[in-house]
Amino acid sequence: MKINRHILDNGLRLVHSQDESTQMVALNILYNVGARDEHPEHTGFAHLFEHLMFGGSVNIPDYDMPLQLAGGENNAWTNNDITNYYLTVPRQNVETGFWLESDRMLSLDFSGRSLEVQRGVVMEEFKQRCLNQPYGDVGHLLRPLAYQKHPYQWPTIGKDLSHVANATLEEVKAFFFRFYAPNNAILAVTGNISFEEAVELTEKWFGSVPRREVPVRNLPQEPEQTEERRLTVERNVPLDSLFMAYHMPAHCHPDYYTFDILSDVLSNGPVSYTHLTLPTTSR
């Protein structure tokens, strides 16, 4: 696979790979911001923005409708490190994708109505995932055991429901202009599109988006764990459950993938070592 690269004057990095076997083009834009960049008393903002980014921009009040009319689809996800948005569109309508992504990078439609709508969606998601089902709050219990100083200690959805509930429009604007910048993003384009056309469309639609002052990340260092940490919680749940976590190498470490595979071998699915060796009522 041939990978092509181009950097715009405003700092946006373009990564491209051509695939002529398909009639589709995919655009993936990754912003270098996640839950680790949040203030400890204002968590859940990165995930809230994943939702706000679909609430319309200054020139495009409805993000989904133009994409659907062009035969495209989209989605997004957030974790502690990054926020990722992607769309696919037929090759003949590829410029629609560039138009949509560049306009919401330039400026969202910061309205109180949009904030209230998306705030409600995120709060309902928090309740359904973390409060209204057995074991839903395990991330809120396990993470502070594993990380006592580093901001990995709270899940992406937020440390406390009140943080999103009390978020103001000014705080939301400040978060956007702090992190949603071309010089803090990577645009990946793949599918039935040449490198020359990808560069041309990227320059056309993203070239005028101004570079912004992105803060230097200065995260607290997590001290080495020297002893076991354990928490026992009694809850009215169907079955007892055991959750164990181990520190492992970072993504950029050469041993990361070895540990990732090891975790699957040990505990992922019905053929994992843990599943096959633990006694069950059927044996």
Locate each region found by the language model.
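M16/MPP (pitrilysin/insulinase) zinc-metallopeptidase core fold and M16-derived inactive scaffolds
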Residues: 26-88, 154-157, 268-276
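An aromatic/glycine/proline-enriched structural segment found at the starts
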Residues: 4, 148-149, 153, 182, ...
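Acidic/histidine-enriched alpha-helical segments
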Residues: 69, 109-127, 194, 213-224
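Scaffold signal of the M16-like zinc-metallopeptidase fold and its non-catalytic homologs
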Residues: 52, 56-57, 97, 129-183, ...
